[in-house]
């Protein structure tokens, strides 16, 4: 090994991930994300590839079943309202899954994009939508939403520019927004967000 960091026991951690017992939408999404990229970091047998791909397909089905008519995703099965953060996270996962070649419903993604666009366009720093996430990190939530839309090839430039103009933009939101700008090819704006913090 060339790294000074201790090795990661992928097999042990993957087994834990595959058998993770918790089932809110955020936890299910967290279970799925590493499975999308594990093929990039480890060699796997055909059996392991099949098992991991089947798990991703299962997660896609579960997440799709938790989408509400407005396009957002519920935090817990049976909820009747969308969680903004979880909607961004679940939709981001579904976008990445589709880009990795997994089958994701166009209807699910389209409804999610519309939900995200509506929230992105109507977002203000004093957003009246109140829950744990929006009270604790509204700027990061908006920056991540904008990033996820860029990943889904539905850039909201106006909303990105409005967020960028905030005087007290948090460091976390700056970095997330910088990533969104970088993906759109505006690396100069991304660098300005990161290095010119005033």
Indicate residue ranges for each PLM-predicted region.
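Solenoid-repeat scaffolds in large eukaryotic assemblies
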Residues: 157-160, 189-193
């Amino acid at each position: 090994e060339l790294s000074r960091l201790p090795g990661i026991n992928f097999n042990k951690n993957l087994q834990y991930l595959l058998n993770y017992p918790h089932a809110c939408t955020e936890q299910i999404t967290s279970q799925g994300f590493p499975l999308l990229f594990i093929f990039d970091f480890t060699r796997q047998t055909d059996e392991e590839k099949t098992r991991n791909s089947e798990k991703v397909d299962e997660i896609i089905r579960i997440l799709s079943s938790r989408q509400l008519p407005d396009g957002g995703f519920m935090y817990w099965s049976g909820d009747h309202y969308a969680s903004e953060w979880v909607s961004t996270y679940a939709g981001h996962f579904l976008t990445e899954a589709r880009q990795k070649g997994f089958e994701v419903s166009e209807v699910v993604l389209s409804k999610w994009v519309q939900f995200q666009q509506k929230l992105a366009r109507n977002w203000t720093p004093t957003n009246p939508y109140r829950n744990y996430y929006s009270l604790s990190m509204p700027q990061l939530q908006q920056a991540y939403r904008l990033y996820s839309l860029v990943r889904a090839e539905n850039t909201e430039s106006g909303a990105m520019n409005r967020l960028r103009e905030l005087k007290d933009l948090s460091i976390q939101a700056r970095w997330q927004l910088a990533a969104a700008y970088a993906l759109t090819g505006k690396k100069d704006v991304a660098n300005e967000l990161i290095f010119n913090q005033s």
